[in-house]
Amino acid sequence: MSNSAIPLNVVAVQEPRLELNNERTWVVVKGGQQVTYYPFPSTSFSSNQFNFICNPPSAQTVLDRLVFIQVPYDITFTANPSHAGITENLLQPGRDAFRAFPISSITNTLNATINGFPVNIELAQIIHALSRYHTPLKVKNGWMSMQPSFEDNYQSYRDADGANNNPLGVFTSAAGLSELPRGSYTMNVVTNTTTTARITGVLYEQVFLPPFLWDGEQAGGLANLTSLTFNWVLNNNLARIWSHSDITNDVSGNSTIGSMNISFQQPSMYLGFVTPRLNIPIPPRITYPYFKLSRYTTQFQNTLAPNASSTFKSNVVQLDSIPRKLYLFVKQSDNVIYQNLNNQITTPDVFLQINNLNLTWNNQQGILSGASSQNLYDFSVQNGYNKTWSEFNGVTQQFNGVSGQPTKVIGLEGGIVCLELGKDVGLRDDEAEGVIGNFNLQVQMTVTNTNQYVTVTPDMYIVAVYDGTLVISNTSAMASIGVASKEEVLNARITHGVSYNELQRIYGGDFFSSFKNFLGKVGNVAGKVNNFLKDSKIASSVLGAIPHPYAQVPGQILKNVGYGESHVGGGKKKGGVLIGGRQLTKAELRKELKM
């Protein structure tokens, strides 16, 4: 008993150098008996779309969920006649490069069918907002370095000219351990003169589509596959694949690049298949994490001059389920970007500064109206945002060392707010992420145009992420979004045996393997969650007893991870950029095995 005013439990912890336990465990990693990677050339392709049939060699193989596309290209640039007489080559170092995620940037919709079930995502509309989340530098300089991925960080490329963090910079301009600029991406420069330029090469890019993965980590693969197809529907404005600094524009704003001709050769998709060992049976039905993204855009006629602020209100959005997350941002209208070639290649993928946010949720008004922009940044960082406060705030300055000259104001990339419902946005007693019903949402934002050169016509985006499950059986697949009822949420009891952070570490992946593998075998955290699941007999209801939306897991999923009628094993790590959550690292596993 402690001498505290409120008695405390006193425990002892061994100092690491005195952990002298001789008992050790040798870990054997059991992989497949055969691992094979196949290129699947497109069955048809054009400047409008790519089509693939990627049927697995056998339903008894497991598809690696890390999938990427390879696209050979040939691009010709022609100088703008208004720049006749220029003496510099058309493509300039630090002023020309591929856009971040170039294939996704020109993909209106990526469609896939899994055993006949359709899944899709509007890549071009959301990739540059969501890529600011759950993509730390380690990921960018690792797996994601196969594609240009350095996001635009200035409101105008002209402000990035000569900077170490210029997204269009070359390899030699990268400082220290920073992210490689997009100008370092390998290409073959066939010609580059004052009047014309031509580049050829190959672009690689991950498949950013649930239930596939794109963070470089492994997870439970897709099994029971009999058919798999992909359809990439491209934008009519293919020039959006390229970024060009407007610092070389003439006084009328005309770019040095007057035209671009973009052609693709036959693309391929690369998929890996693992044949399990004979003593590792594949269950007839497997449940995977799945999320659906819905985009709601409100366009405005008002314009914002440089440094001007205004308040904008979205249309009322009707939802039939409570989403897990909301991504909110305002950016230059696509109608403006696609007006001409100059706008397409010189407009960075950036956002307006968010000063204030006011939500109306299910007729409750004034939600988060008192939150400062610093609060909104904090919410976003907690939810996986990778950028600094200055970048989120969208503005910085540069002192002028010359007497009498003003300090230069520089516009930075601006903010994307991410809110988690149930944590950042309060919900009623009978509401939680995944609850089915009729809900209305309206967003009001006060924003500032921090671009020091360009007037902005704003579009407001609301991207809702709905969490659910994808069940794949021998011949079919089916997704479920909105899996909890109000009655289950009301009847769920609160437990103090599992903390929010503990649950976050294990949530967000392959349900059929993550809970079973992590919770059932190692660690005190695992034991607490494991015992709670058993003691509360929650396999037939929802994990709403844990005060966080991550805990709203349907009973059927729990049965698939070993609680209830079925019992399935496996191994898994992460669920992808939008989810987060992880299994034990190897270092943590070694530590736990020594305990």
Curated annotation (Swiss-Prot):
This is Putative capsid protein V20. May self assemble to form an icosahedral capsid. Most abundant protein in the virion. It comes from Sputnik virophage. The keyword Metal-binding does not apply. It holds the Pfam family Sputnik_MCP_1st. One of its GO terms (cellular component) is viral capsid. Keywords: Capsid protein, Virion. Its main location: virion. It is found in: Virion. InterPro entries: MCP_V20_C, Sputnik_MCP_N.
